[in-house]
């Protein structure tokens, strides 16, 4: 374990000397707005990051993913160094449309940062960048350090090849830290649920509700039965392996016409692929049984984010990072499995050591109340500089 007073003092001085620069960079990054569909603004964010990566001596590039999605921005320090890459990853897109900063501008107050995306997950990018900057200034050349951020994590990735590129860059690495925000309770995430979107379509028979009521087959009525039955698939126990939530419904045109069409969309969460198969089988059974004779229901899988499962390599990565944190008096309190899909799943799927929720701590993601704790920003920089110097723990 490399933990010397000399290195500790060097890191402390680096953070103190760069506090103003860190906040300025944080502000600039948050002010680069962009959500799914705002390709021009997201590209500006990617270019901003690429420029800054290059300014600190990283070899950097934008990688096009297609499908109308924003590019991946990546930079590598010490590309020719021996050993495998230590990767800091995540996303630079947010859920907030351009213009949100006018209503909720970046600010720091009472030890917290506020603004669109400060917690999810631009704070994690700031940590990653200043870790790389420190390692460059310290003359660290022991292993390659890669920053790798996608621009479509908060989006439906249909038509793009982001997932294939993540898997490509994840293969053969030393370890990856997904810099999504940490909970304020301090746990590192070692598992996340997968999420799958389904479209349910009911075909009925249109008719006039006054003149031909009995001839009609109300698609909305049939859908109402389907929704209740689909919701009931969710096990009632707390440690359930999957859940079904029908969250969108569309049907009908006017009140004086029995609708022949209704569609709904369901969100399915699951801890492993076996659980998804079990859940999906029950969903198909529900949709194949017509309550109203003469109606037909179709169930179609639309999009999937696979679960981040706790492999042996994930356990090894957690043990190593926890050892570093404990040695330096850090704030990692334990490990946690949580809801909400993430790209750590694709690192894990190719056998990589990977951890999630390694970034800044905060709360109220995806809302105007979102905030991040500044002390965790500096603590994160300190933690991962030490992690880099102790790269052998992750082998």
Question: What is the predicted function of each stretch?
Answer:
Residues 1-10, 17, 24, 55, ...:
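Metal-dependent amide/peptide-bond hydrolase catalytic core
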Residues 2-116, 137-140:
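Acidic/His- and Gly-rich active-site-bordering loop/insert found
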Residues 61, 87, 146-148, 298:
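A structural signal for isolated positions on well-ordered beta-strands in alpha/beta enzyme cores
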Residues 85-87, 113, 174-178, 197-199, ...:
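Short glycine-aspartate micro-motif
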Residues 93-109, 177, 191-201, 323:
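Acidic-glycine-rich active-site phosphate/pyrophosphate-binding loop
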Residues 99, 109-111, 131-146, 230-240, ...:
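Phosphate-handling active-site elements
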Residues 112-126, 208:
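Glycine/serine-rich anion-binding loops at beta->alpha junctions
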Residues 121-193, 393-395:
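Acidic/histidine-rich catalytic neighborhood of metal-dependent amide-processing enzymes
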């Amino acid at each position: 374990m490399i933990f010397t007073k000399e290195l500790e003092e060097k890191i402390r001085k680096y953070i103190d000397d760069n506090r103003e620069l860190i906040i300025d960079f944080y502000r600039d990054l948050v002010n680069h707005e962009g959500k799914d569909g705002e390709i021009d603004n997201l590209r500006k964010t990617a270019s901003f990051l690429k420029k800054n990566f290059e300014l600190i001596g990283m070899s950097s590039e934008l990688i096009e993913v297609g499908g109308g999605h924003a590019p991946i921005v990546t930079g590598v320090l010490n590309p020719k160094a021996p050993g495998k890459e230590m990767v800091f990853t995540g996303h630079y897109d947010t859920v907030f449309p351009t213009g949100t900063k006018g209503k909720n501008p970046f600010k720091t107050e009472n030890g917290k940062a506020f603004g669109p995306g400060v917690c999810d997950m631009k704070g994690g990018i700031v940590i990653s960048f200043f870790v790389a900057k420190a390692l460059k200034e310290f003359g660290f050349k022991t292993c390659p350090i890669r920053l790798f951020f996608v621009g479509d994590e908060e989006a439906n990735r249909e038509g793009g090849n982001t997932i294939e590129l993540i898997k490509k860059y994840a293969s053969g690495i030393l370890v990856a830290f997904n810099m999504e925000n940490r909970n304020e309770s301090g746990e590192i995430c070692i598992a996340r649920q997968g999420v799958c979107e389904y479209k349910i379509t009911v075909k009925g028979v249109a008719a006039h509700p006054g003149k031909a009521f009995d001839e009609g087959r109300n698609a909305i009525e049939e859908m109402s039965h389907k929704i209740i039955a689909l919701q009931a698939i969710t096990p009632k126990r707390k440690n359930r392996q999957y859940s079904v939530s029908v969250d969108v419904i569309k049907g009908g045109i006017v009140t004086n016409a029995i609708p022949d069409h209704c569609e709904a969309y369901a969100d399915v969460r699951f801890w492993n692929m076996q659980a998804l198969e079990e859940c999906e089988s029950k969903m198909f059974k529900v949709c194949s049984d017509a309550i109203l004779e003469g109606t037909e229901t179709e169930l179609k899988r639309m999009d999937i984010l696979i679960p981040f499962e706790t492999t042996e390599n994930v356990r090894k990565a957690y043990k190593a990072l926890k050892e570093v944190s404990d040695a330096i008096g850090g704030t990692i309190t334990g490990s946690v499995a949580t809801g909400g899909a993430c790209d750590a799943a694709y690192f894990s799927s190719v056998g990589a050591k990977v951890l999630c929720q390694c970034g800044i701590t905060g709360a109220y993601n995806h809302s105007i109340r979102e905030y991040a704790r500044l002390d965790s920003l500096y603590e994160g920089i300190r933690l991962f500089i030490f992690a880099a110097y102790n790269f052998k723990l992750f082998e």
